[in-house]
Amino acid sequence: MQSKLLKGELDLLALHQAQPTRYPFLLESVAKSSQNHYSLLFAFPQQTLSLNHLTEPSFVQQFDQYWQQAGVDDRAQRHLPFRGGWFVYLGYELAGQLEPSLQLPSSSKALPIAVAVRIPAAIIVDHQAKTTTFIAEADFADYLPIMWADSQALPHLSLNSQALRLNLQEDSPELFLNGVQQIREYIAAGDVFQVNLSRAWQGELQSTHSAVDLYQRLRQANPAPFACLAQFPAFSIISSSPERLVRVEQNVIETRPIAGTRPRGQDAANDQALLQELISHPKERAEHIMLIDLERNDLGRVCEYGSVKADELMLIESYQPVHHTVSNERGPLKAGLTPGP
C-alpha cells in the first residue's frame, strides 16, 4: 500500500460534491469521540457486485470469491481504519438468502438488496491527530497524485439554502397495532422470542435538493458518530447513527449495542433527572441485558468457543438530542474465517 500524509483536516464532503463519480462514498464521524475519530472518503470505484432478487445466485458466496481473488494486503499500516478493500451495502432483505427457510416476502422498494463495490483508494481524516492520509493499494499507486491534486484544487462546499419542503407518509397506526397483536400470538405459540417491529416512512420532496444538501441538513440536525453519504448511479443512501454494529481489528471482533434512550433535558437539572431515570428503569435494564445476550450469541458463532466477553457494560453515552445506554462485547475470531459462509 502507498500513502501520503497531509497536515490538517480535508473537507471530504466538498470533495465528494465536486467529483461524486470519483469519490462516491463518504463515511463520516460528525460527533467525535475516542471510539470514532476517523472520516473516510472512498475513491476510484472498480467492479460492482449487486443482488436485485433473492432468486439470484448467493451474494455472500460471490462476494467471498471476489474478496479472496483481490487478495488485499491489510498488514501494512494497521493503524489506519481502511487499507483498500470494498464498500458494501447490505439490505435487511438479504436475510432471505441467508435464511431461506424463513420465506421472507420481497421488498416493494426499487433498490438492490445488496451491493459491493471494489475500492482500491481512499482519503482518511484523523480528527484527533488533525491529519489527512491519502492511501492506495500498490497496484493502484497512480491514483495517489490524482487525489492529492484534487485536494489542492478543492472548491468550497455549495449548498442549497432553499427551504426543504417534504410530503411525509407513514404506515397507518392500525397496521402497526395489528403487527403487535400478531407478534404476541407468535410469542405465545413459541415461534419467536424477539421481534423488531418497525414502521415505514416515505417522503417526497417538493423542492429541488441534492443528496449532499439532504446529508448536510441531517448531520446538522443529528450529529452522530457514524454518518454516511453513498451515491450510486440510481439511488443514494443518507444516514446518521450513534451505533456501531461490528468492528474487526487485528482478528478481534466487537459489537457495541444500544438499548435504552431518553431525550436530553430542557435544563441541567431536568437532563440529570432523565439520565437517572434511564439508568434505573427496570424495563430499560431488562431490554438491554436481553440484547447483550443476543449479541453474545451472534458473536459466538464466529469467535473462539467461550471467548466472548462484555468489556463495557451499560454505560451512558450522551449526544446532542438523546442519552443512550451502551455496552461493548468482543472476542477473537476463529481461524480461517472469510466474509462468505
Describe the role of every protein-language-model region.
Residues 1-341:
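Extended alpha-helical targeting/anchoring segments
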